[in-house]
């Protein structure tokens, strides 16, 4: 998987595998990795972390299927939006059903889900720097507007620069905190595993909550099953669909086992968390009196090693995490809108979408966290249900592509995709590419 990330180069028609990876990571790494992980611990106990890890393997499989199928249906090399027009849903739905699903995705990505990211930025900046939410909202939409009006290629370039930087910085802080509390390693991991199976005396009564919140927050953090990573995957320049499917599966592992785990370990190693029984409202463990579940746990954890720095650092990190997630949301909304409107009307439609997206983002910054999370949960539910239906129906061809890819590797080949082998019609991009590969092979002989 790691080798595949470095393969392929960007062009005027598409992006490299590395750019596609960073674009998908910009969507996966967000509020869910910081605030979401903390709320998982708050309502599911330390055992929720284990179930976040477990759901990762299922999430990686779904990411492979959805991304590989998106590469199946790439039609040409000159339009990144057309590359994803005929999505996985086309095989699951038909006629008006497909159009309605596209509209629902646009609603989720452009209206319902950006607010929760923007709200988290506003809250963290208010806590760390005392900046009013209104001021933060104006700043966020100004920077976001510059990015999305710059075009999809600029999104790829921005993600390529920002995502590795913010993730590495966040991980270095986590490593420093773990090193400072290294003697707690056996106790913390023992607590995670015991709590995950109800064997811990303190958290044994919330075993069901540990599983539920671990799965919920794990899915929210890595966006597995939502189809978001498939959009940048479709724009990547590769010779076989399975290559990007595996790259996107790898992005799930990076997201959870590095960023989510870093957040969880910072919180647990420092003991900066509360655990609440969601059913009864009883506080089982209270280490942070008066602190609401969310990014405040992570801020307090970093403050234990870097007093006065924790809140500011997490606020800045959360800004990058949430901001890159938001412009990834816009990219997805735009590619789906391209399916619904004619090419001559796309300019106007995209401009209107940008305005709606910025308005929804600003709305999220000035509203309460409860409102923002409620809207985000609705959007998340829409994305997951729509995409899982398609994944179940399209698993077989994606699996066949993986076997084809592995067989070619065993033969010492750089895998090339033959669309006709899978009965995929009108896949001109892959048909022409395979013909060129066959011609080269014939000349070599």
Swiss-Prot record:
Post-translational modification: The N-terminus is blocked.
Subcellular location: Cell membrane
Transmembrane keyword on record: yes
Keyword line: Amino-acid transport, Cell membrane, Ion transport, Membrane, Sodium, Sodium transport, Symport, Transmembrane, Transmembrane helix, Transport
Gene Ontology cellular-component terms listed: plasma membrane
Membrane found in the keyword field: yes
Membrane spanning stretches: 41-61, 103-123, 129-149, 159-179, 188-208, 249-269, 304-324, 349-369, 375-395
GO MF annotations in UniProt: amino acid:sodium symporter activity
Main location class: membrane
InterPro entries, per the entry: Na/Ala_symport
Family matches, as Pfam families: Na_Ala_symp (PF01235)
Membrane topology summary: Multi-pass membrane protein
Function: Mediates the active transport of alanine, driven by either an H(+) or Na(+) gradient.
Protein name as it appears in the record: Sodium/proton-dependent alanine carrier protein
Similarity comment: Belongs to the alanine or glycine:cation symporter (AGCS) (TC 2.A.25) family.
